[in-house]
């Protein structure tokens, strides 16, 4: 496969070659021995939903019993609020505590629209309702909101008011407008929108069936305002596009060059129908595009698109591609023109399940848009590089007075420029990740990545980009990518967090840097998740350093949130290597085995016993040592058919007297080894145990006799002290007690006997009735 070209097709032989490459990769992954390198891909810390609740670092939103499907979030750091779009509802929540004094707007779909939706064969619960898909800040006082309206999208304005302390939060239901080309009809269709300069840019389907997809601009205060969209007549502009994200990004210091970049995936058909595939794209348009004068009227005249590549280079030239873009995140930098672009991709194969994160630079994206165009003679031909004359001004360039005083708007573009852009919207070259390969990948796991947000964190030993990755099973991975020697990258999965009680796909995530919180939405709920939980790593300096979490450092007393400061304080942290020896060498308790838990266990000869040892870190490897009774030396325990090493500890079958001693469970991470558990095992001889049991049995009989005697003595006193209490009454009482005891002792058997007795009685009465009827006749 020619990796330097975007639109070159894959032939059948190339597809077959790629299939063999996939199979070789699968076999390699399946039969790869478990090494320390593979252990690094395991999450170091795995916390369940219950663990997160107990740590008070995960707060579920409890205020919605009727409105679910939380896939639209709008975070307002300035006001300290989170707007949540759900089914038939819009919620106003506090960023500090989701459940504190929240407000809601009930906005259902019209009843007649719900009935029409049902008649069209749509699901009454999952589709025929008003699912909120657009929440965009319109100005300082209003938010623009759109809902699917039971496949009849509507939009309106929510008034928040100017007072930040007392928000109004009211929907203006008297000025609702059509949501077509602004909001999808289908609540489950991928969709992207952004509001800038009071213009709404949306990528969505424009019809009920969802076949016609378009990227549009609407609203605005321009006097000659018209909605602008992609050209529906040209199939190679957009082909079944699924929009993922859209962002305003300035290209230069000149505002006339400002552009809207949008990311999507679409179908690509090359030549014949057998060459259909899914491609991920980045597209762009100029913000000041108003359409053409004689051609492309009310259509984009600056629309261009290029392919995004996310693949693992193969040794034999066949790359492993992750073609389906799932989410995009722009990490801001000091230069607003050059944010870092993070993308989550998945494989299209149903056989091979994999996900990857690829990182792109805006410089590389712009270079592709400034490069050669792709050309296609007809629908049956393939894309090739265009080598002909390129008209002036270069197609895709924004009109600017500084660029050309004669071209003040896109309506001033010459006809040959409009004609060229109409037939050549595709760039020939593709955009590749900055490292030439994925920054992070998950292969051969039971989930796929769905969402991403990234936080740039300053640590003691450098700066790191921490990725929070949502999955389709309701977990969040906290990942840091660390640069090593020779530009090699190390993927470190710090945490795997089960943020929902039951598996559910994560649909949206918003990051609050001010609150240091992550807000995670799914079909089933919304949770507020802390970015860090340093105290869960341990109570020693070594535990804190081994965590390699850029958010956390040892402050001398505990593992706590690291804050960069000019003051010289003893903050111990080693994200790059995770080596406690270099950081905690002067803290004896942190590197000594004296901090290990100590337990005493008794085992019986010839029986089995289990010595539990579960390291907090899943990346640690465990070794066992024994110091036998009367011996000063320790020896390493080697597993055999009698001694079995498991992930949870050591199973010793058929205990022997020589197994007595002190057992040390040592965990190793990187080069650091420390004892986490010390177990003293005492083996009781079998003969001694039998004698003890015999003595206990005899002693138990005496105790029962004494206890029974005490009961009898109480009863005798009761008879003597109560002249009205006869001996017959006492005997009858004792008989009932014994009967009750026997019944409780064998209650299942007793119930069975009672049922049998009832059946016999019923059968007897039935037979008697039949006999009486026969005699009567």
Swiss-Prot record:
Pfam families: Ig_6 (PF18452), Sema (PF01403). Residues 44-531 form the Sema domain. Residues 592-680 form the Ig-like C2-type domain. It is found in: Secreted. Residues 740-777 are annotated as: Disordered. Keywords: Developmental protein, Differentiation, Disulfide bond, Glycoprotein, Immunoglobulin domain, Neurogenesis, Secreted, Signal. InterPro entries: Ig-like_dom, Ig-like_dom_sf, Ig-like_fold, IL-1RAcP-like_ig, PSI, Sema3D_Sema, Semap_dom, Semap_dom_sf. Residues 533-585 form the PSI domain. GO terms for cellular component: extracellular space. The keyword Signal applies. Residues 766-777 have a biased composition (Basic and acidic residues). GO terms for biological process: cell differentiation; nervous system development. Residues 740-765 have a biased composition (Basic residues). Residues 1-37 form the signal peptide. Disulfide bonds join 117-128, 146-155, 286-398, 310-358, 534-552, 665-731. Glycans are attached at residues 139, 607, 724. One of its GO terms (molecular function) is semaphorin receptor binding. Strong binding to neuropilin is mediated by the carboxy third of the protein. Belongs to the semaphorin family. Induces the collapse and paralysis of neuronal growth cones. Could potentially act as repulsive cues toward specific neuronal populations. Binds to neuropilin. This is Semaphorin-3D. The gene is Sema3d.
